Amino acid sequence: ILANSHYIAERIRKVWRREAEVLHPPVDTDAFTPVAGKQDFYLIASRMVPYKRVDLAAAAFRRMSGRTLVIVGDGPQMAAVRAAAGNVPNITFRGHVSKAELVALMQSARACLHIAEEDFGIAMVEAQACGTPMLAFGRGGSRDIVRTPEEMDAPTGLLFAEQTPEALIDAVERFEAMGGAFTAEACRANAERFSAAAFRQGLREVVARHLGHG
């Protein structure tokens, strides 16, 4: 059995009482590359559906007038997200954007946000491939994808423990206090762990182990 994250491997263990090997899905890291020059805004790009919890990002930044949030995406929960944001000037809605526009936003954002509990979370890899750190909810695939200061000397983001505006506000404040601890180089290097080439190599290794040769 193959699982796309350790989070899913643990669920397989609990529900089916079977062990699963983890093979992360491939991400087109060549399509998401860093550029020089960050701008002073945070980005969340998501479908507007309840489990994505974009409303929490809006509610948090409504209380952080000195921080700018750009929200990309559309969907059935858009009205609820707009209501959570209020009419504050530091939150901008971009709606649906092209892939090129999304890449440009990811490249220039100060950090990207991910509040959903995902099985994996490809967008988190795409953001880091652009050299952009992640602030993410610390359950699900984010634990495989985001490298925190507690784990390594070249971190790529922070994880927060609760899906609440308060937890996100705290994460933003911690991120700002850490200054230059999160580099584009570290983010890009981390994203390469999930490249198509890394996936092919991992799959070859799985096949070789189970066929008994390599």
Model-derived features with residue positions:
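Acidic donor-binding loop of glycosyltransferase active sites
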Residues: 107-119, 132
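Nucleotide-activated donor-binding/catalytic signature segment of Leloir-type glycosyltransferases, i.e.
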Residues: 79-101
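Donor nucleotide-sugar binding/catalytic pocket of nucleotide-sugar-dependent glycosyltransferases
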Residues: 1-33
